[in-house]
């Protein structure tokens, strides 16, 4: 299972609530990573992927059970079809030639020899859904971050992965990105995956928190249990809607946002869009019990302020429910103590202000400079312009 499914097969999975799985030779085995309807993914060598494809199921012992029968009804086992080292070496010798690589890669560096050198300025195409002029120096991203009166976009638990933050699986029609691509005239069979559209922010920003396995603690059933899915609750109205629709509401209001999370926020693949997506959504700060190292760096690079709760303090001890307004005050410096100011209404209708000490997770002076510039691209632009003036 990879990429788009046959619509009939996909509908069968939905109608029968099947526990569909994927077997792959890559390393992306997060829930829903290969496809939103693949509830689990198993990693295997390429020959094993072929063997499981022949069997059509994982509900058997591949070492002892048969994969199927031959034309005479005799059972066929894995050992019967498993290639020997000699067979593999012979195929590689026939199919892989050094000349293949020389023919492709050597001319790549002979610029202007075989064809006219291209202009260094890219001719942006407004209808492209694969590469588009990035918005990182204009609009909302050019405005100062106030870190004041922020609304929570999501309150999340532990072990939030970059795949929760910005999935890379196949785009389905009823997703926000799928609906956008359809409006752009792209047929469903050509939607491809989120990862292939990472050069187009209008497609990929709609993937922010689009993972169907997400648990946003702001979205609950009447019995108090958390609903699973790409959902958000817009405040102060308290209306629950699809995550992207909530982001659009807040973008139209120019409402600064914050994310509250548990331990190990941002683990998994070092995906740049996990940081880009939340910044484009208007998130100015993320307060968590802990950050994965690379993702924390990516947040700084996008101008999002990572803040860490002190030991013994978290979203549960503070009884956060998403109705609050958040502000951050203090001197931003490497690992300095800042104050998270939480304003909320009490049960008797009064306004309560809670001040919580948090650690600024800008860990070096250079990270402070990058953050203050608005991100690594903005810092690069500043240095470039200052260098030209000098």
Predicted regions and their residues:
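Fe-S-dependent hydro-lyases/dehydratases of central metabolism
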Residues: 1-390
